[in-house]
């Protein structure tokens, strides 16, 4: 890489109350040995519930290499990222997915002469996490990034991004106004009133900025032209969190370009425009030429005056200084050369990565042909599969059902079949289609009586909805789940199933990879003998796996004949089950039910309240308001917080005042959670923890 930032080299450490067990020690050892011996592609075939996530974390700890983990969708990426943050709390675990909550790409339909403007809704929190991932990668080696295929899309050059980075330290000579100009050049905006992420404000000799990848603000205090002090502070309360002798501040956009680079880009865009206009006019496409001239001239003016324009990514080839046809810079370019790639659910993710380029290219080709974009817009694209392979090194493929591609690359798979809990793969029962609904109803009632749950998978949406209506009429608490159900509702339904508010979910293709439901003891597969994508060997194995987290897990396939896919799935499940039974008998293990916490923000609040109460009962009970009076507590204005902080410093009993502040912030945390401001509640929780740590130190010191 062409930039020079010294990365902090901190060891990867897994912090877990558990040790590797079952097949995990053998799998970790074999994976690590193969990678250390230089094998480029290694496959871990891990049965559902065997702890593939923990195995991956221990593998990273063993290899001590920065790691990229690619997931097939945002939901699984978020789930895995949360698990890794628990397993590696002291390392930089980042989340990198598309920041669009809604995205309608720019498109043109020639048949109806319809132009569709790009329309999108950006999620600010996800954008912050993307910037946090790139900032971590450039400053630390102990990085794990959990991403989706978003990581193969263009992102601007790491050299330019790092080159525009600002390094500040106490005692440094820099003029305040020069610093403000640097912030503007890095695409930060000045806003002295609404102080939010990506903005800075000035108060006399004090400059405050919230980097686009941070939740805390940075305060830079000047004495003349010298930086006197640097601190991080809570942007809401104004409380100083920590003193920072030095800081790195990265640009507010990944598509940032210096003056020289921008000047060169403007020149090459004009040259390409002139050439393309001439070409279109020779072909008699006057309308297309006029359209392209008007749109590109406007974009050039915006780039000249502001440094950015709508759809700036379409000019990324010029801004990066790349040759025509060359691949874009992506997140992969931000990693050190020795990074490890882990592809989770590889049977889904590998084809997904390979398919991204063509879909993007066909849409852009139409835009270019009809004068909506310059031909260089074609180079703002995802990586092609061969380009992706050139940029990655050693790869671990994880799946319960590895695809033919990865099986063909690897010299035998590493198996992880034995579960640490001793749980077995479910029994499989094949029953005739005739009378299947009444038989299913009887099985569901038996599960409901035992306080267990059931999943039913159908082939069509209509069938899912009709079956749901039928079960509802017979008093079963049931909901359906298919592609028309939005993501938030999907998460809510799965939570309701785990809590027992509903007993059955009927779905189509959504009950497969990564669904972690220990309460489910029955999985019913209707029309199991209808061959196709939803009833292939891999789909059946994944669906069967949903019942593998319960001691009494059973799978019922309703079919009049046994297809080849069914036979393979049954044989593989029986093979795994026999191996698991033999291991349990040899080691005297009784299968234990998997107890998985139903995570909730209320759990976090309750846990924090217990800890706070225990601490404050040590002599600070009169501080603040008595009892739980968090309803309606206003959030502190930053100015009031500054005043409050000064009062605490002047007070004769600092510990007492600190306890008072902890109570106030606890009340604010509850208020934020009730208003569904979970990000704010989490920030307040973190600050409360810091203050409690300080109070404990004071108590221990006898203050």
From Swiss-Prot:
One GO cellular component term: cytoplasm
Domain UVR: 659-694
GO terms of biological process kind: nucleotide-excision repair; SOS response
Protein residues bound to ATP: 46-53
Disulphides: none
Subcellular location field: Cytoplasm
Domain Helicase C-terminal: 436-589
Pfam families per record: Helicase_C, ResIII, UVR, UvrB, UvrB_inter
Helicase ATP-binding domain sequence ranges: 33-190
GO molecular function annotations of the record: ATP binding; ATP hydrolysis activity; DNA binding; excinuclease ABC activity; helicase activity
Main location class: cytoplasm
Top-rank taxon: Bacteria
Subunit structure: Forms a heterotetramer with UvrA during the search for lesions. Interacts with UvrC in an incision complex.
Protein name: UvrABC system protein B
Gene that this polypeptide is encoded by: uvrB
């Amino acid at each position: 890489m062409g930039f020079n930032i010294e990365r902090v080299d901190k060891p990867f450490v897994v912090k877990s109350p558990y040790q590797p067990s079952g097949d995990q020690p053998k799998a970790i050892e074999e994976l690590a040995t193969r990678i250390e011996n230089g094998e480029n592609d290694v496959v871990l075939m891990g049965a559902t519930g065997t702890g593939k996530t923990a195995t991956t974390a221990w593998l990273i700890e063993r290899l001590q290499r920065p790691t990229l983990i690619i997931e097939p969708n945002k939901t699984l990426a978020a789930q895995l990222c949360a698990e890794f943050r628990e397993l590696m709390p002291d390392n930089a675990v980042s989340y990198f997915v598309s920041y669009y909550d809604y995205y309608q790409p720019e498109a043109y339909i020639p048949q109806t002469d319809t132009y569709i403007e790009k329309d999108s809704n950006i999620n600010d929190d996800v954008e912050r996490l993307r910037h946090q991932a790139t900032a971590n990668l450039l400053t630390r080696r102990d990085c794990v990034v959990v991403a989706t295929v978003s990581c193969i899309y263009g992102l601007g050059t790491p050299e330019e991004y790092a080159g525009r980075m600002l390094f500040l330290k106490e005692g440094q000579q820099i003029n305040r106004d020069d610093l403000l100009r640097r912030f503007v050049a890095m695409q930060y905006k000045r806003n002295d009133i609404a102080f939010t992420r990506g903005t800075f404000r000035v108060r006399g000799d004090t400059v405050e900025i919230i980097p686009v990848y941070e939740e805390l603000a940075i305060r830079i205090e000047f004495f003349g032209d010298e930086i006197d002090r640097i601190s991080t502070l809570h942007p809401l309360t104004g409380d100083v969190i920590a003193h920072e002798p030095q800081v790195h501040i990265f640009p507010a956009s990944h598509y940032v370009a210096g003056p020289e680079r921008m000047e060169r880009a403007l020149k090459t865009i004009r040259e390409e425009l002139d050439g393309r206009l001439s070409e279109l006019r020779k072909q008699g496409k006057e309308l297309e030429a006029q359209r392209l001239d008007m749109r590109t001239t406007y974009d050039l003016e915006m780039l000249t005056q502001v440094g950015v324009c709508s759809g700036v990514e379409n000019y990324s080839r010029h801004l990066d200084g790349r040759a025509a046809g060359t691949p874009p810079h992506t997140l992969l370019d931000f990693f050190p050369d020795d990074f490890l790639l882990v592809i989770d659910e590889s049977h889904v993710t590998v084809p997904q990565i390979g398919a991204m380029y063509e879909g993007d290219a066909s849409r852009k080709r139409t835009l270019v042909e009809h004068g909506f974009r310059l031909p260089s817009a074609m180079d703002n694209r995802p990586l092609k599969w061969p380009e992706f392979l050139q940029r990655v090194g050693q790869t671990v493929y994880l799946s319960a059902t590895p695809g033919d591609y990865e099986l063909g690359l690897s010299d035998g798979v590493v198996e992880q079949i034995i579960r640490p809990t001793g749980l077995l793969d479910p029994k499989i029962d094949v029953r005739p289609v005739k009378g299947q609904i009444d038989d299913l109803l009887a099985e569901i009632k038996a599960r409901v009586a035992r306080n267990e749950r059931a999943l039913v998978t159908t082939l069509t949406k209509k069938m899912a909805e009709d079956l749901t209506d039928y079960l509802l009429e017979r008093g079963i608490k049931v909901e359906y789940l298919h592609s028309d159900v939005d993501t938030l509702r999907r998460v809510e339904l799965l939570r309701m199933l785990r809590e027992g508010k509903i007993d059955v979910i009927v779905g189509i293709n959504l009950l497969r990879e990564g669904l972690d439901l220990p309460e489910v003891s029955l999985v019913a597969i209707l029309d199991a003998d209808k061959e196709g994508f939803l009833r292939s060997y891999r789909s059946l194995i994944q669906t069967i796996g949903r019942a593998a987290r319960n001691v009494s897990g059973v799978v019922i396939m309703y079919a009049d004949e046994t297809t080849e896919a069914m036979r393979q799935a049954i044989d593989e499940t029986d093979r795994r089950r026999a191996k698991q039974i033999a291991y349990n008998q040899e080691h005297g293990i009784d299968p234990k039910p998997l107890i998985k916490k139903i995570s909730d923000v209320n759990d976090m609040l309750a846990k924090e309240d217990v800890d706070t109460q225990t601490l404050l009962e040590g002599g600070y009970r009169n501080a603040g308001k008595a009892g739980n009076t968090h309803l309606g507590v206003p959030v502190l204005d930053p100015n009031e917080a500054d005043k409050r902080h000064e009062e605490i410093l002047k007070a004769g009993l600092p510990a007492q005042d600190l306890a008072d502040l902890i109570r106030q912030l606890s009340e604010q945390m509850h208020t934020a959670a009730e208003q569904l401001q979970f990000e704010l509640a989490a920030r307040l929780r973190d600050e409360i923890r810091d203050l409690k740590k300080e109070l404990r130190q004071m108590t221990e010191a006898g203050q």
